[in-house]
């Protein structure tokens, strides 16, 4: 049988020795940077890569980072379930968006200072009072106390159920992913970008190595000036062909495609 270790460094460190599979795979889908992992993961993960027959990751950056420990380290992409994202559906406007002026620049996801650039958002929103900035998701303490809350054109709508977030996205005029660039996000695969694109939405995002995969389908930005320029461009009405291409591109990131790549690297 095959053994697949899904980023489980501690509990699975001796799994190869105990289970004796004919082929072992270590799946690396995140930089393990939290306090729980920080003490031992930098020492153990390279050794786990070395003892595995194959290492796969969901982004080029995460694969490249461990190639010195295992030459058989490859990016297999990220599978995303987009079955509920359908532009033919008529999604009802959420009640807490009814009185928000348009155009709306929106984000869906955890609103955390570990991943999002609050100061960038503040600069952009401050300089663009004609736009509404909507954040859908639970906030950490940093964001709860941030001056963003003092801006009348910034709206924090709180955490929603996953199935509800589609309605919010569908009523954004532009979708955004204003990430910080740090050890967590530099190789992180942004599944929400695929969700945005699956609805045909124009997307602006912070430029990272992984976001290069989306070149030609999103606006990749660095700094407030580029973000503001991208928002202005993204709000210009576009053709149905471009919308269709966004949707089609998002649907290339399927679990089927990811697993097919995985199988192509398994050599038994």
Where are these regions (language model features)?
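Carbohydrate-associated surface elements
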Residues: 61, 76-82, 88
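A short, active-site helix/loop in glycosyltransferases that binds the activated sugar's phosphate group
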Residues: 52-75, 213
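Conserved acidic donor-binding segment of nucleotide-sugar-dependent glycosyltransferases
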Residues: 217-225, 233-239
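Nucleotide-activated donor-binding/catalytic signature segment of Leloir-type glycosyltransferases, i.e.
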Residues: 143-169
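A charged, aromatic-enriched C-terminal amphipathic alpha-helix characteristic of glycosyltransferases
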Residues: 239-267
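Conserved donor-binding/catalytic core segment of Leloir-type glycosyltransferases
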Residues: 97-115, 121, 133
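Nucleotide-sugar-dependent
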Residues: 163, 167, 175-198, 204-216
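Membrane-proximal helix-turn-helix segments that form the acceptor-binding/catalytic region
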Residues: 36-58
């Amino acid at each position: 049988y095959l053994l697949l270790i899904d980023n489980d460094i501690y509990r699975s460190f001796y799994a190869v020795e105990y289970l004796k599979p004919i082929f072992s795979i270590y799946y690396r889908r995140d930089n393990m940077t939290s306090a729980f992992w920080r003490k031992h993961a930098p020492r153990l993960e390279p050794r786990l890569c070395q003892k595995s027959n194959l290492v796969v990751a969901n982004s080029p950056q995460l694969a490249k980072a461990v190639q010195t420990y295992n030459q058989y380290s490859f990016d297999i992409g990220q599978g995303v379930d987009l079955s509920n994202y359908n532009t033919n559906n008529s999604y009802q406007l959420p009640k807490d968006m009814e009185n928000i002026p348009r155009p709306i620049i929106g984000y869906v996801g955890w609103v955390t200072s570990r991943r999002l650039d609050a100061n960038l958002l503040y600069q952009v929103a401050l300089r663009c009072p004609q736009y509404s900035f909507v954040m859908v998701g639970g906030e950490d303490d940093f964001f709860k106390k941030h001056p963003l809350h003092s801006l009348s054109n910034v709206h924090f709508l709180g955490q929603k159920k996953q199935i509800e977030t589609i309605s919010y996205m569908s009523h954004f005029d532009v979708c955004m992913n204003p990430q910080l660039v740090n050890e967590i996000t530099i190789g992180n695969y942004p599944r929400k970008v695929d969700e945005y694109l699956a609805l045909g939405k124009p997307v602006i995002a912070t430029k990272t190595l992984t976001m290069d995969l989306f070149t030609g389908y999103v606006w990749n930005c660095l700094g407030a000036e580029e973000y503001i320029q991208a928002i202005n461009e993204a709000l210009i009405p576009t053709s149905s062909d471009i919308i269709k291409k966004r949707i089609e591109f998002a649907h290339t990131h399927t679990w089927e495609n990811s697993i097919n790549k995985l199988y192509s690297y398994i050599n038994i």
